[in-house]
Amino acid sequence: EMNFTRTMHGVMRNIAHFCSRSKSRVWGKDGWQKIVVCIVADGRKKVHPRVLDAFPAMGVYQAGIAKNSINGREVKAHVYEYTTQVSLDSDLKFKGAEKGIVPVQMIFCLKELNAKKLNSHRCIFQRFWSTLNPNVCILLDVGTRPGHDSLYHLWKAFDTDSNVGGACGEIKAMKGKGWMGLFNPLVAS
């Protein structure tokens, strides 16, 4: 759950950054209303139970409601939607408006079966994007912690040049406290 909360808290901090841009023609105080965070869990039995425990804390998911079948038909996925005003940081501490967290619109799709990453991407693009009709889509893997304004800079690349069809950000290794992570050869390289 630490990887999930690290990523989710970073996304929520980025949404707060969008809302802090008071002189922007696009963003500002209510900028959060233009952003929807979609999370896909690839397989109900595959997702770690402690990750699922983080969702009710944010109000997005209720355990025990999802059923494997309805009227004899297999269920493919369960979709939950909520506008949360609470974040869990990587230390599993609650953060809210007092720490600069703004409301975040969330869609959580819990797939019954693990069908791998490409199927999850297709699920997002086919099922949600046709309804949401976004101008920009940013994909993040669990464990990636975006910098406080990195999603804004990715969005800005699309906003300033309509010919941009894709963009990627820079990935930096988390070095840990006192750079202790550098003792790990994978981090150090």
Swiss-Prot record:
Highest taxon in the source lineage: Eukaryota
Entry EC no(s): 2.4.1.16
The keyword Transcription is assigned to this record: no
Keywords attached to this entry: Cell membrane, Cell wall biogenesis/degradation, Glycosyltransferase, Membrane, Transferase, Transmembrane
Membrane topology per record: Multi-pass membrane protein
A molecular-function term among this protein's GO annotations: chitin synthase activity
GO biological process: cell wall organization; chitin biosynthetic process
Compartments where found: Cell membrane
Enzyme class: transferase
GO CC aspect terms: cell septum; plasma membrane
Principal localisation: membrane
Classification via Pfam families: Chitin_synth_1
Chemical reaction(s) catalysed: [(1->4)-N-acetyl-beta-D-glucosaminyl](n) + UDP-N-acetyl-alpha-D-glucosamine = [(1->4)-N-acetyl-beta-D-glucosaminyl](n+1) + UDP + H(+)
Family stated for the protein in its record: Belongs to the chitin synthase family.
Role description: Polymerizes chitin, a structural polymer of the cell wall and septum, by transferring the sugar moiety of UDP-GlcNAc to the non-reducing end of the growing chitin polymer.
Protein name, as recorded: Chitin synthase 1
Source organism: Tuber uncinatum (Burgundy truffle)
Encoding gene, per UniProt annotation: CHS1
